[in-house]
Amino acid sequence: MGFTDETVRFKLDDGDKRQISETLTAVYHSLDEKGYNPINQIVGYVLSGDPAYVPRYNDARNQIRKYERDEIVEELVRYYLQGNGIDVK
């Protein structure tokens, strides 16, 4: 499948945004409790898609796998921009 030169729209509903945020928080705490660097592990998972970056501890691996990685990235970007004073629509 080839790429198109036209802009494609991607939309995530508000309920999913909230659930992704809660899931990332829970996964962060699980990673921290197990002695991992949570940021590095989450980035590793998001970039590679390899669930081995997230432990099974507290069901963290299954929780994060409920969402597509692009949905996780969208929520992270939204949160970052809002935290820097940008009115994200």
UniProtKB/Swiss-Prot annotation:
InterPro entries: IreB. Signal peptide: none annotated. Transmembrane segments: none annotated. Belongs to the UPF0297 family. This is UPF0297 protein SPy_2114/M5005_Spy1797.
